[in-house]
């Protein structure tokens, strides 16, 4: 019975005169809010040809969605991942409700050629992020242990910094010893602040630098 009451609206646009993204944003503001990740996905895909949409979705966006999901809860962390990604790229921390706006401001795609390199980089970093939210996916036991300790201490404000360090390790800019030192320093720093009574919420700006 509920499906029988479902209504669809088809809007015809003129490619040269109408801005589909702006129309979509206007429609979205009148109904149930989409997540920041949903808005970014639509922004990324909307202006592409169908063949390019399929390629970007299948090769990049779908893997990003899968990798940025918690194994235990099946909770999507795509919005959080992109927020952390933007934090270390811009050295500014986006408001949780304005991640889409910040992403759109930084990446104004004109075509498939300008979009694909960004999606390639996002896909590379989400592979690191997957190990932060799912430490069991990290194959190295020592690294896995340090990530679990960081998560146990709930120092997720360090994620933007760790993503950069992890990528250096992945690209062999640093070795495993340096990675472990960085992960241990994060914990030591958090404990020292806790002991002297300093709030943990201020650490995000420190790690951002």
Language model segments and positions:
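Polyanionic (Asp/Glu-rich) segments that form extended negatively charged tracts
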Residues: 1-209
């Amino acid at each position: 019975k509920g499906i029988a009451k479902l209504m669809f609206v088809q809007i015809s646009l003129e490619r040269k005169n109408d801005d589909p993204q702006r129309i979509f944003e206007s429609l979205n503001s009148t109904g149930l809010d989409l997540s920041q990740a949903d808005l970014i996905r639509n922004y990324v895909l909307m202006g592409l040809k169908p063949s390019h949409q399929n390629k970007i979705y299948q090769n990049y966006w779908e893997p990003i969605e899968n990798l940025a999901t918690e194994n235990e809860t099946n909770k999507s962390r795509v919005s959080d991942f992109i927020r952390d990604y933007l934090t270390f790229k811009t050295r500014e921390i986006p408001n949780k409700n304005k991640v889409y706006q910040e992403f759109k401001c930084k990446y104004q795609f004109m075509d498939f050629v300008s979009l694909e390199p960004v999606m390639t980089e996002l896909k590379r970093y989400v592979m690191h992020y997957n190990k932060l939210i799912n430490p069991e996916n990290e194959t190295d036991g020592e690294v896995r242990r340090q990530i679990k300790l960081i998560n146990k201490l709930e120092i997720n404000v360090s994620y933007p910094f760790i993503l950069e360090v992890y990528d250096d390790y992945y690209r062999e800019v640093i070795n495993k010893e340096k990675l472990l030192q960085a992960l241990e320093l994060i914990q030591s720093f958090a404990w020292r602040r806790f002991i002297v009574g300093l709030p943990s919420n201020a650490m995000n700006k420190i790690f951002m630098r």
